[in-house]
């Protein structure tokens, strides 16, 4: 892509237990910039356990489906009456093994973008994840139009974290 980009990311831990992430970038030519992060969470307190028992809410009536290579098709589809519907909180496990639903079958779980209803309004929660074991809740707020949710579908125990703990399939969301 053309141009030189200077990018900055600021991580701020707040007094009210929030992580505030701010991205900025400047360029000397028109170019494409797509800044993101890949944070995954297991709120149970035990990273050796799958996070599929976590309760997930996504403030989105639509999602963007992917093809068999995990590339978005460009379509925007309603979540209504599909396993992609998290407008009512439910466990990640509830529909994650739905092999009759192509979007989940192809990705071996969730690895999709939801089109948020928040319209950039930072006062509205975009997503909420809660561990029923620990009671810890993570709320996500964003001014972006979408949110990607990945359920660790291809973690296979070869990645080691703190204290040598291995991350198995679906160890985080």
Regions flagged by a language model, labelled:
Residues 1-173:
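An exposed, glycine/acidic-rich loop-and-rim segment of catalytic or binding clefts
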């Amino acid at each position: 892509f053309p141009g030189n980009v200077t990018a900055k990311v600021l991580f701020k831990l707040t007094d009210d237990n929030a992580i505030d992430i701010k991205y900025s970038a400047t360029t000397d030519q028109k170019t494409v910039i797509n800044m993101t992060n890949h944070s995954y969470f297991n709120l149970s307190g035990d990273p050796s356990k799958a996070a599929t028992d976590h309760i997930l809410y996504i403030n989105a009536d639509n999602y963007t489906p992917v093809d068999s290579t995990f590339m978005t098709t460009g379509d925007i589809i309603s979540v209504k009456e599909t396993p992609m519907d998290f407008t009512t909180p439910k466990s990640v496990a509830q529909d994650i093994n739905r092999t009759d639903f192509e979007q989940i079958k192809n990705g071996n779980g969730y690895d999709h973008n939801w089109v948020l209803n928040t319209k950039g309004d930072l006062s509205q929660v975009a997503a909420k994840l809660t561990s029923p074991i620990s009671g810890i809740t993570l709320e996500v707020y964003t001014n972006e139009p979408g949110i990607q949710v990945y359920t660790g579908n291809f973690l296979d125990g070869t990645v080691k974290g703190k204290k040598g703990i291995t991350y198995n399939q679906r160890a985080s969301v």
